[in-house]
């Protein structure tokens, strides 16, 4: 037999392969026994806090993730993905992203900008001539920063353009999605002010589709999901069976009841994607480590934009933006230095989500819940207060 060859019999220094295997097994077993003692103490605090928030807020299901030093360090699910069937939330549970989808649209737009395929200063009609002129020049930059004057939900009349479609689910086509609102009057002149709008990002996704010469959803798949290994990120098409999709819940008359399923296909670029917690964490980690755009592009994307009269908007290009001055974030342990955070939140039927990144520290937290009555700011703030790095001594 090969393991009794002369190389072992005649060499006293040779190590028997069986002994090597047993030594490896012993070392691995020892490592597994010691592992619980090596778990960072903050993870237990996170677990306790999240369970407490679930109880206080009567949340049904929750998943959270923590990225520290540019690495995913914590991922966990809590509660029920389907309360009625007693299906627990796991890392495989699928939650709607809601408006965090806007950051996907922002990244795909900036990737095209890097390739000179999308000009941020160009009129959106240069890419999407189907959109009416409205006696205004709406630039790509305006759409990326919520300054295009496109109607949102309740801040102006939404005028649909009726038409017959050859398909049962026409809004898989982002150009056709424009028929939901393209006849609506602008709510303000482009660049005049910041006015948050999901429909503005639908128009932006149409420009991305035209500039990239590929379906918008496929650009997200090929240039974001695949490079980051996000295996579950996809459009949340209600007519498709998506394994592990969470049931949504809301409060009605003080009771937590099942939410209504709604079609979000028409607003894919503004709030139509779904994934598990692992993939949202991978997106945050990829952003922090410049895996999707160049560092200079990321800096541009995460620079707070201004209106025509130089008023700061609190929003970058596809990402919300907040600067906390010295001592302002005492409850989150910001301490003595200013802190700049970027990210996005999401709110719609069946979900509340949040992704907050601290670029200077390569740190992020991600939160997803199927309870649309959740106070996501409170929950995320509590999570941040635990994982926030200690302030250096004077």
Set out the residue ranges of the language-model regions.
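Short, mixed-charge aromatic SLiMs
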Residues: 129-137, 224-234, 305-312
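Tryptophan (W) side chains
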Residues: 2-3
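Short, surface-exposed recognition loops and adjoining beta-strand edges that mediate ligand/DNA contacts
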Residues: 234-243
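Active-site-proximal loop and beta-strand segments within enzyme catalytic domains
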Residues: 80-198, 212-214, 240, 247-257, ...
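Alpha-helical scaffold elements that line and support the substrate/ligand-binding pocket
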Residues: 64-66, 70-71, 96-119, 123, ...
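Catalytic loop of the DD-peptidase/beta-lactamase superfamily, centered on the K-T-G motif
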Residues: 38-76, 155, 209-214, 218-222, ...
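N-terminal leader/targeting segments and the immediately adjacent pre-domain N-terminus
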Residues: 10, 16-89, 95, 111-119, ...
């Amino acid at each position: 037999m090969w393991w009794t060859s002369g190389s072992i019999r005649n060499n006293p220094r040779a190590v028997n392969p069986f002994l090597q295997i047993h030594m490896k097994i012993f070392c691995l077993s020892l490592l597994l026994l010691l592992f619980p003692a090596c778990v960072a103490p903050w993870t237990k605090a996170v677990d306790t806090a999240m369970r407490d928030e679930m109880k206080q807020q009567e949340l049904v299901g929750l998943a959270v993730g923590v990225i520290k030093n540019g690495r995913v360090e914590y991922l966990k699910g809590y509660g029920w993905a389907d309360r009625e069937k007693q299906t627990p939330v796991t890392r495989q549970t699928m939650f709607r992203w809601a408006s965090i989808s806007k950051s996907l649209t922002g990244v795909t737009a900036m990737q095209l900008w890097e390739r000179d395929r999308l000009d941020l200063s160009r009129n959106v009609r240069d890419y999407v001539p189907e959109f009416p002129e409205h006696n205004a020049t709406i630039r790509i930059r305006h759409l990326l920063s919520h300054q295009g004057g496109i109607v949102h939900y309740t801040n102006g009349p939404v005028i649909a353009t009726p038409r017959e479609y050859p398909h049962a689910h026409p809004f898989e086509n982002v150009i056709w999605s424009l028929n939901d609102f393209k006849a609506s009057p602008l709510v303000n002149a482009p660049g005049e002010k910041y006015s948050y709008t999901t429909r503005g990002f639908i128009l932006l996704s149409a420009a991305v589709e035209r500039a990239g010469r590929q379906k918008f959803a496929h650009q997200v798949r090929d240039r974001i999901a695949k490079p980051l290994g996000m295996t579950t990120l996809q459009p949340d098409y209600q007519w498709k069976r998506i394994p592990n999709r969470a049931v949504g819940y809301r409060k009605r008359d003080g009771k937590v009841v099942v939410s209504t399923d709604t079609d979000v296909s028409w607003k894919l670029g503004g709030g139509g994607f779904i994934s598990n917690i692992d993939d949202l964490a991978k997106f945050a980690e990829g952003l922090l480590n410049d895996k999707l755009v160049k560092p200079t592009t990321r800096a541009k994307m995460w620079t707070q934009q201004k209106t025509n009269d130089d008023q700061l908007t609190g929003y970058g290009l596809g990402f919300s933006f907040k600067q906390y001055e010295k001592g302002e974030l005492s409850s989150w342990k910001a301490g003595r230095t200013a802190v700049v955070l970027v990210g996005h939140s999401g709110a719609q039927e069946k979900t509340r989500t949040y992704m907050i990144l601290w670029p200077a520290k390569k740190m992020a937290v991600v939160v997803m819940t199927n309870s649309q009555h959740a106070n996501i700011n409170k929950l995320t703030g509590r999570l941040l207060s635990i994982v926030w790095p200690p302030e250096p001594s004077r």
